[in-house]
Amino acid sequence: STYELAISEPLPDEPHALPQIAPYLVSRFYQERNGEYSRSTINKGIQTQVEDLAERWSNEFGRSDIRNLAILVIDIPSNQVVAYCGNVHFDRKQGGNQVDVIQAPRSTGSILKPFLYYAMLQEGSLLPDMLLPDVPVNINGFTPQNFSMQFEGAVPASEALARSLNIPAVTMLQRYGVPKFHSFLQQIGLKTINRSSSHYGLSLILGGAEATLWDVTNAYAMMGRSLLQLPQRSCSLLLPT
């Protein structure tokens, strides 16, 4: 009978929690797309590796009271986002862990230096082996210092960039022009650098501005595509449905 067949069926196993993969991206999609069905460009294998990496470094940085970090990975040839880790410990309600750090403006620090080198290389006003001065300077009262608090004299441009030296970067920006560099940064999509160039001044190259990891990573991907002579196109998070 139906009853006998029913009671002979084994009981289902206890339900398990569904895996949480890219929860910050899922939350973003939910807010921006109102729950509409979406297919992301995320590579599950890479995403899992990135989340494990973020968890491991979160434990390491936690000893220095650093509670938030994010990782964004873009595949240059396809220009698709393959990993999106907006923060760590999504399930925690404290310490800002539910903030998607990828979308949150942060001080640019030294991360804009490669864009200045790129812009000057592209126009031919800089060569990789060109010697740059790393000496004490005073520009209208602005006296930049290197992190080491030391001076190297004359340094090849490639080495100055690799070592993230501040003084060569400032003198290069002075030569290139703050308004011109400010315009270039806006052209490559750094939308949060939205005040006048005079507001930032030469400190623009030393962390005097804010940008999101999303915009900065997309700009680096643009630079990579340019160097590989690939056509420029917008970075994608979604696959066709």
Language-model regions, residue ranges each:
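Non-catalytic, structured segments within soluble enzyme domains
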Residues: S1-K44, T48, Q186, L190-S197, ...
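A short, well-structured edge-of-sheet supersecondary motif
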Residues: T2-L5, S64-Q94, S183-I188, L237-P240
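Second-shell loop/turn segments in exported
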Residues: E9-H16, R33-T41, E60, Q98-R106, ...
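Surface-exposed patches in mature extracellular/periplasmic domains of secreted proteins
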Residues: Y37-R39, N59-I71, D129, I193-S198, ...
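Beta-lactamase-like hydrolase cores
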Residues: K44-D75, S158-L161, Q174
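Active-site SXXK
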Residues: V50, N79, Q98-L132, A160, ...
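Active-site-proximal helix/loop microenvironment
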Residues: K191-T241
